[in-house]
């Protein structure tokens, strides 16, 4: 019986959590580290106390359990926090600090000091959107971003070791923080470090998030970033293999945001592997997808690559 089926039956959530925790050989304090006190964890498992929705969701994700079948009434403050997080996330994706930074300020005013999950989200968003200096919005330096992101991950994983990611337990948001750390190392030209992080993350996602539908976007994201690093370091055959893993995940989970870029990356790798006909085939697919979703920026980048590698020897 799968855990998704267990949650649908008449088991209270604490019983499901306790069963899975014991199955994984975890102590209560290990599971709830950075989220809540062990005594709260004990009360949760015995049905005597229910934590906030965000804390419960994080615990379930760390256990690799689906969190989409747990429903709770939210307080007014929790609803406001959730709404602000949704708006800020949109600003992160659209790279819109003008709208995002004021929303972060609003969130900071209402978050409780012991709400490590929301504080982690705030730090991650600041690393993405930047800061205000003398009335101007400026990005953080790469080293400042690293400091912010390590502070963020250690709010909920105090003993986090970037060289031993597999030793920890992480939620979806925690994996996003670690992924962001890897992108900063890449920007610092520390590609070997970034590759090691992505290797560990991909392994973790495959093992721990099989039952969590909401994690579907993580594998395409991490696989694309991992393949890009391999491409940058000339490991083209490996890059194709990882990119194809990301492609399959895009289709499996219905998460297509990274699909055109993933296919374009495969195309570039085949060019460097001296397989230009195969490369052109993949470039055409990527170009069609970028055009289909009206991603003019992506299409422009692809056309520039095609011109660079093939000149006029390319027919759409």
Name every feature range the model reports, one short phrase each.
Residues 54-69:
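DNA major-groove recognition helix of helix-turn-helix/homeodomain DNA-binding modules
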């Amino acid at each position: 019986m799968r855990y998704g089926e267990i949650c649908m039956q008449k088991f209270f959530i604490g019983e499901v959590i306790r069963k899975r925790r014991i199955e994984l050989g975890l102590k209560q304090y290990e599971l709830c580290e950075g989220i809540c006190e062990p005594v709260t964890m004990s009360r949760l498992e015995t049905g005597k106390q229910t934590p906030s929705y965000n804390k419960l969701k994080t615990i379930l994700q760390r256990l690799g359990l689906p969190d989409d079948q747990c429903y709770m009434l939210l307080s007014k403050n929790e609803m406001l926090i959730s709404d602000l997080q949704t708006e800020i996330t949109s600003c992160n994706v659209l790279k819109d600090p003008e709208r995002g930074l004021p929303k972060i300020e609003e969130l900071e005013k209402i978050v409780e000091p012991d709400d490590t999950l929301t504080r982690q989200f705030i730090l991650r968003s600041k690393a993405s959107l930047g800061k205000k200096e003398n009335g101007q919005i400026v990005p953080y330096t790469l080293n400042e971003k690293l400091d912010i992101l390590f502070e963020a991950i250690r709010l909920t994983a105090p003993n986090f070791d970037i060289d031993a990611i597999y030793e920890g337990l992480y939620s979806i948001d925690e994996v996003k923080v670690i992924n962001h750390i890897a992108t900063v190392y890449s920007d610092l030209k520390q590609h070997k470090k970034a590759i090691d992080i992505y290797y560990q993350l991909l392994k973790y996602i495959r093992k721990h998030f099989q039952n969590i539908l909401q994690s579907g976007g993580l594998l395409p994201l991490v696989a694309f970033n991992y393949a890009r690093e391999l491409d940058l370091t000339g490991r083209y055959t490996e890059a194709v293999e990882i990119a194809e893993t990301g492609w399959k995940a895009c289709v499996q989970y219905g998460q297509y945001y990274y699909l055109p870029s993933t296919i374009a990356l495969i195309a570039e790798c085949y060019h460097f592997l001296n397989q230009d006909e195969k490369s052109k085939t993949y470039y055409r697919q990527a170009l069609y997808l970028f055009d289909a979703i009206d991603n003019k920026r992506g299409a422009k980048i692809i056309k520039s690559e095609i011109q660079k590698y093939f000149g006029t020897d390319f027919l759409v």
